[in-house]
């Protein structure tokens, strides 16, 4: 098993510690010394998790040189879905991965690890899938 491609996307807006300290009782120095964080990305009203996930997925597909309809699984690991019913099916539709099963996995900071393990185990449970195909997620 191997990871053969990846994609990433980030929100367009940046908020500095100084701007954050105007909203909550803190300071740039307090945040920076305890976390090392200087700024963070936040979605604008016209950006959603789905948009970011679709962009990242498109990058991964391009890097791997795979067509979206070759995907068997779209697994979205997030603690911030766009709605309570999950975002993976919308990402699947946005990627045009009509042959893929799509579901969300919510596991906070360990979400990536759980998603990786789940994706690796998926072809074991569903033997009609091939391992290279499932890793196209």
Mark where each language-model region is.
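Short, glycine/acidic-enriched loop or turn micro-motifs at the edges of active sites
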Residues: 8, 107, 133
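Active-site glycine-rich loop that binds ribose-phosphate moieties when present
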Residues: 136
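Conserved "HGTGT" condensation-loop signature of ketosynthase/thiolase-family condensing enzymes
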Residues: 1-73, 95
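Conserved catalytic cysteine-centered active-site region
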Residues: 32-51, 78-126
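Short alpha-helical scaffold segments that flank and stabilize functional sites
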Residues: 56-63, 91, 118, 122, ...
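Conserved small/polar residues in nucleotide/adenosyl-binding loops
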Residues: 127-133
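Conserved beta-strand segments that form the floor/walls of ligand-binding pockets within enzyme
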Residues: 2, 75, 104, 130
């Amino acid at each position: 098993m191997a990871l053969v491609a990846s994609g990433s996307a980030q929100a367009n807006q940046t908020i500095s510690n100084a701007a954050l300290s105007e909203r909550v009782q803190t300071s740039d120095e307090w945040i920076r010394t305890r976390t090392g964080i200087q700024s963070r990305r936040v979605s604008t009203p016209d950006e959603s998790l789905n948009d970011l996930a679709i962009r990242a997925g498109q990058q991964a597909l391009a890097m791997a040189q795979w067509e979206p309809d070759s995907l068997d699984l779209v697994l979205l690991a997030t603690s911030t879905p766009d709605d309570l019913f999950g975002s993976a099916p919308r990402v699947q539709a946005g990627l045009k991965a009509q042959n893929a099963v799509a579901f969300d996995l919510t596991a906070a900071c360990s979400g990536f690890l759980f998603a990786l393990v789940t994706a690796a185990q998926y072809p074991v449970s569903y033997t009609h899938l091939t391992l290279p195909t499932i890793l196209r997620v």
